[in-house]
Amino acid sequence: EMSFMIDETGQRILRLIDVHKDQIIAFAEDIAAHPEPGYEEFCTAGKTAEVLKNLGYKVTEHLARTGVKGTKSIKEGPSLTVIGELDAIGYHSHPNANPVTGVAHACGHHAQMAAMIGCAIAMADPDVQKCLAGTVNFLAVPAEEYIDADKRARLKKEGIEFCCGKSEMIRTGVFDDTDIALTTHVHMVPVEEDFYLGNPACNGYSAERVTVRGKAAHGAIDPWNGVNALSITTSAIQMMGLMRETFREEDHVRLHNVIRKAGDVINSVPDEAIVETKVRAASLDKICEITDMVNRAYAGSAYAFGGKIEMEKLQGYMPIIPRAADNALIEAADDLGLNYRTVQKGDFNNA
């Protein structure tokens, strides 16, 4: 049951959402059924642009390749940007995964996009706009999930500098006119309530692409004349595993490796291996410290086998500082009678 505290404009917004409920849900289900990987969300972007145009927003497309921005200036005032993320995450075994790309909306971006569209529907109403001042932007951003280094190399030829869409949009000035950015996401910490208000602390990360150089030799006739790049890689990853006992729980360290290449043919000693390594932690100092440990593992293993390594630094993310829920969020949740809790000390998102 709604509280009497919601004003007439708020009541109208709620009615608009209810009236368009089926449209909003259908949009989410359509996006979920057609997942697309980062920087390739052409179908999702097209559907988003069409909805925003039909609502009367001034729409700009192809921002950072697939991004879409719908804008409406009402009166002089601050500029609010509501963000939705276009891409799906790699998850080949998901029942709704795209059979070609292997991505699925397992991270809930289809729900986030629907929330953005619901807000756009409400803000497009003339009676609602009469009560507002400023500019509202609806920004559908590409590539929130980290894209692999091979795709990054291809996109760099098209002028895309960053693996992640919001970073690329910051670089190209898309956020320059934004005073307030607002978004939502499915829960990333264990929460029983339906709504979780505020921002918990979150890991940042550093990423590298490591090329391991060995020496080819016949795997049966003279393997002793080779330097096995796969063995160097395996040894380095084993060292990282043995380091894990030094990681403190309060630093929230997470360490990931994906071997992209480990030789070409089975009867030759692999002379090249390619690994992508990611270090997550709660502070920049700890990210740098663990990254140095990882790099020593690669260097030490290469030295032991007589190989070489080449390292390419990839884009990372800074750790997120926790932010308490704004009073406006709490008051709105109370007025709507929602089942919620706010960010608490100790809440942490390891992603």
Where are these regions (language model features)?
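Histidine/acidic-residue-rich, glycine-tolerant segments that coordinate divalent metal ions
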Residues: H94-A104, H110-A111, P126, K130-R254, ...
